């Protein structure tokens, strides 16, 4: 079972529209492998959790491990046995990779993680106030600023030149 329940199931931002969603960003969730791409299939898969589970089953099968009942997406039982863990790279490395590669999925997941840390809710909506509050604490005027996603891809985002200069300085 691919369990991405740390975050909600908003895999793309509604405001992106068809030109951006599943092309420039998304789908993304708390469990994401290869940006939801599966070997042997074109494009990204609709459900990143299922795609990650499918990739794990493929890798295990290639190593002679038999997996019964295939793969899927859902929430793991609290009684499930942990068979492995992965430690995250340091946040500074993640942000560096995001900035160098213009990684929109990482930007969106970091926004949801802000929501988890601040409110216990892994949602874009829960993360957005953290952005506004932080900018205000840094002395950035929010007049004319509208942040609707983590990547900046939503066409209704707005960031003024004055806010950008204030942020840089």
Model-identified regions with their sequence ranges:
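Periplasmic/cell-envelope proteins involved in peptidoglycan metabolism and beta-lactam response
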Residues: 1-36
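A small/polar active-site loop signature that marks catalytic segments
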Residues: 37-169
